[in-house]
Amino acid sequence: MIDENFQRSQLWQQLKADFPEWYQTNIEEAARIVSAGTEADMSKHLIVQLVELRRKNAEHALAADTSKLINVAQSFLANLKSLASHSAATCYSFIGQGESSPAVIELFPQRGYGEAIEAQIAAIFEAVSDGRKSPVSRVRATKSDYDVLAAELTKLGWSKADLRVFADPKALAQTEHEKVCKMVQDWFSAHLAISDAAVQERLLFETLRPIVAG
């Protein structure tokens, strides 16, 4: 029954096709947890396992076609906006802890929030699948690439002081949660607004690394 329910989801269809043994093991464990506990316990278990699988396959995701990387960035931004609509604290916890954040785990099974969380995870595993089949080698972003990104951020109202704060982990940690959440949304919006495809590709390769590997 759990397998039937999960196969209505694009994410779980992808995982069953690409990681059949992992899928079977975790579906069986999810069924056991639900019978002995709660849906919240099952969600926590699945998130933990998904994060572990994502980290193991990070290099495959980063080797995907650029269209897949753009999709990851778009889905990450959509998820940030969704979580921010719940609260700045939830958005901030996601930025710091990823899907393993207790706040995110709590929202994962909830309508209105779970869809965006799942879509972001699904986008990463679509990239993993693509990168495993047809890996792409990429070069690192250059200073001139980051100058292009800074110009896009300036269009969004960023000052030089904002750029310095965002580049300084200590300063960012002292910034209001709501502003940090907005800045990270701007960061991804700016990447997606870059018109030079080669520049955008190099920057996404750098920016998405902590998203898929962290």
Residue positions per predicted region:
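Arginine residue identity/basic-tract feature
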Residues: R8, K16, R32, R54-R55, ...
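Extended amphipathic alpha-helical interaction segments
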Residues: S82-K170
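Alpha-helix capping and helix-coil boundary motifs
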Residues: S35-L46, D65-T66, S87, R138-A141, ...
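Aliphatic-rich, non-membrane protein domains
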Residues: I2-N5, S9-A17, L62-S67, E115-F125, ...
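A cross-kingdom marker for long, charged
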Residues: W158-G214
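N-terminal Sec/ER secretory leader and immediately downstream segment
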Residues: M1-E99
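Acidic-enriched, low-complexity/disordered segments with a strong bias for Aspartate over Glutamate
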Residues: D3, D18, D41, D65, ...
